[in-house]
Amino acid sequence: MKTTFLEFEQPIAELEAKIEELRFVQDDSAVDISEEISRLAAKSQQLTKDLYATLSPWQVAQIARHPQRPYTLDYVREIFTDFHELHGDRTFADDLSIVGGLARFNGQPCMVIGHQKGRDTKERALRNFGMSKPEGYRKAKRLMELADKFGLPIFTFVDTPGAFPGIEAEERGQSEAIGHNLFVMAGLKVPLIATIIGEGGSGGALAIAVGDSVIMLQFATYAVISPEGCASILWKTAEKAPEAAEALGLTAHRLKALGLIDKIVNEPLGGAHRDPKAMATMLKRALAESLRQFQGMKTSELQARRHERLMAYGKFKETGSN
């Protein structure tokens, strides 16, 4: 698949276009221009390194939303075996913005749950752009409870702009569904490893992310609101999104410094979409390390750690009154 370049990557896009042009000429020419192609390829790689070494939070947010970025089912195919998808919340409907099912991780039975976006217009609409409704979160809760019943570790993958804000979602109890998930996750007797693979949007992300270990990919984001939404509230214009992204502290390194996530998994040069297989290999290693850390831990300790993490989200400091 041809790489789609973001706006800030245009200098790289121009170099890559030139390289492709020269390769096309090379195929039909007796003149050897391989040395020039190699020179431009090295220049493109160095430019990518330089650009990605100084990314702003707003640029990171754009990478997290990249249309070619691996989604949950891509990681399921690369990391797990024997995946069998389970459907429906047994109450209302089957929300396709959340996928989940039984699988094996390094031969061990487990439960996998995650947000799923679409690759084309039809699939994006079918999966509601990764914005889950109450029935999606209730499906996730059902699968978590099933895993808990059979003693299976749970792996969740977060990639959502946020919970769906439509009227019908509110009518069916969106906030109750999210809140109930937090309650259930806090009390699970099995390890839960959560990974932010793209966008981690507010309560819609947290609803499947109260884990014993929270992993975040290098160019993923995690925040209480999107930069555009924040800018629209504070400055009354979405054009201030870059400033909002800076203020939100949504990048992996910022969140790790704040103690809100546990581990950062580096991405291939140019982002996970440049080499999905390499990304999956690195993530699988991190998941295995996290699972080893918590497997065999006493239930009471798992629950206490999770409750402590949940209570640590959002703090305030008394400054005195006038």
Swiss-Prot record:
Cellular component per GO, a single term: acetyl-CoA carboxylase complex
Gene3D superfamilies: 2-enoyl-CoA Hydratase, Chain A, domain 1
Keyword match Chaperone: no
Domain CoA carboxyltransferase C-terminal as annotated: residue spans: 39-293
SUPFAM superfamilies the UniProt entry points to: ClpP/crotonase (SSF52096)
Pathway: Lipid metabolism; malonyl-CoA biosynthesis; malonyl-CoA from acetyl-CoA: step 1/1
Catalytic activity: N(6)-carboxybiotinyl-L-lysyl-[protein] + acetyl-CoA = N(6)-biotinyl-L-lysyl-[protein] + malonyl-CoA
Entry keyword set: ATP-binding, Cytoplasm, Fatty acid biosynthesis, Fatty acid metabolism, Lipid biosynthesis, Lipid metabolism, Nucleotide-binding, Transferase
GO BP terms in the entry: fatty acid biosynthetic process; malonyl-CoA biosynthetic process
One Pfam family cited in the UniProt record for this chain: ACCA
Compartment(s) where it occurs, according to its Swiss-Prot or TrEMBL record: Cytoplasm
The keyword ATP-binding is annotated on this UniProt entry: yes
InterPro entries, per the entry: Acetyl_CoA_COase_a_su, ClpP/crotonase-like_dom_sf, COA_CT_C
Stated role: Component of the acetyl coenzyme A carboxylase (ACC) complex. First, biotin carboxylase catalyzes the carboxylation of biotin on its carrier protein (BCCP) and then the CO(2) group is transferred by the carboxyltransferase to acetyl-CoA to form malonyl-CoA.
Name the record gives this protein: Acetyl-coenzyme A carboxylase carboxyl transferase subunit alpha
Organism annotation: Ralstonia nicotianae (strain ATCC BAA-1114 / GMI1000) (Ralstonia solanacearum)
